């Protein structure tokens, strides 16, 4: 299939041949859910920690004698039912990350791209050239090509030797724009693509993805 390439003004300047699989795959919502859940789990720091009764300082002495006071028996001031006591079933640092099979990741990526393409919110632009990084230029470009009701944009970029220093200048120009998420074509995440109102590719980024999918 052929995908239309747009310039900075949103006008068509050519086409790019890509495999149908990228934008014409069946959308698997269950797989998208699993892939996004995996990405969010892998991001978790898992540093949460509270103290058990064994770890709370103090509480070694019996607060009062066992019998004769009329009060409930108590063996420690650090019991979980006491104020200042330890926690029961306390959270401890743990690793939430887990591995998702490569084939599932691949199908989830094709699903989200096909979903966005089918909803007509995916656009491909020719590669940008810069004399110097310019956020103002890219912010103006985004506001010009973005649909009125769209807010979040996922911008997929790809590095190539032929671009020279333009790749780094593009990153510097885009990274401070509000509601824009940069995505690397070499390691694409499902989460930012799925939750973006619009998805933009540079021509190089789509070419790299096409080569990867073709194998």
Curated annotation (Swiss-Prot):
Q: One short Pfam family name for this protein? A: Ribosomal_L4
| The keyword RNA-binding is annotated on this UniProt entry | yes
Q: Give the superkingdom in one word.
A: Bacteria
GO MF annotation: an example:
structural constituent of ribosome
This protein's GO CC annotations: ribonucleoprotein complex; ribosome
For the biological process aspect of GO, one term held by this record is: translation
Keyword Transmembrane helix listed? The answer is: no
Q: Which key words are in the record?
A: Ribonucleoprotein, Ribosomal protein, RNA-binding, rRNA-binding
**Chain segments carrying region Disordered:** 43-97
Similarity section: Belongs to the universal ribosomal protein uL4 family.
Q: What does this protein do?
A: One of the primary rRNA binding proteins, this protein initially binds near the 5'-end of the 23S rRNA. It is important during the early stages of 50S assembly. It makes multiple contacts with different domains of the 23S rRNA in the assembled 50S subunit and ribosome. Forms part of the polypeptide exit tunnel.
What is said about its interaction partners and assembly? Part of the 50S ribosomal subunit.
In Swiss-Prot or TrEMBL terms, this protein is called Large ribosomal subunit protein uL4
Organism per entry? Brachyspira pilosicoli
Instruction: Give the lineage.
Output: Bacteria, Pseudomonadati, Spirochaetota, Spirochaetia, Brachyspirales
Q: Which gene is annotated as encoding this protein in its UniProt record?
A: rplD
């Amino acid at each position: 299939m052929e995908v239309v390439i747009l310039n900075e003004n949103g006008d068509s300047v050519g086409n790019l041949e890509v495999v149908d699989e990228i934008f014409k795959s069946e959308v698997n919502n269950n797989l998208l859910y699993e892939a996004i859940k995996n990405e969010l789990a892998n991001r978790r720091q898992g540093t949460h920690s509270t103290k058990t009764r064994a770890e709370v300082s103090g509480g070694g002495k019996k607060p009062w004698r066992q019998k004769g006071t009329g009060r409930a028996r108590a063996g420690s001031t650090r019991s979980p039912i006491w104020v200042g006591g330890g926690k029961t079933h306390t959270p401890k640092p743990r690793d939430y990350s887990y591995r998702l099979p490569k084939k599932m990741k691949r199908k989830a990526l094709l699903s989200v791209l096909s979903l966005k393409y089918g909803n007509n919110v995916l656009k491909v632009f020719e590669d940008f050239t810069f004399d110097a990084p310019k956020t103002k230029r890219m912010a103006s470009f985004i506001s010009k090509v973005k649909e009125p009701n769209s807010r979040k944009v996922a911008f997929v970029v790809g590095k190539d030797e032929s671009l020279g220093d333009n790749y780094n200048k593009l990153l510097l120009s885009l990274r401070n724009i509000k509601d824009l998420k940069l995505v690397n074509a070499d390691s694409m995440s499902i989460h930012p693509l799925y939750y973006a109102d619009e998805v933009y590719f540079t021509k190089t980024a789509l070419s790299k993805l096409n080569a990867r999918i073709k194998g």
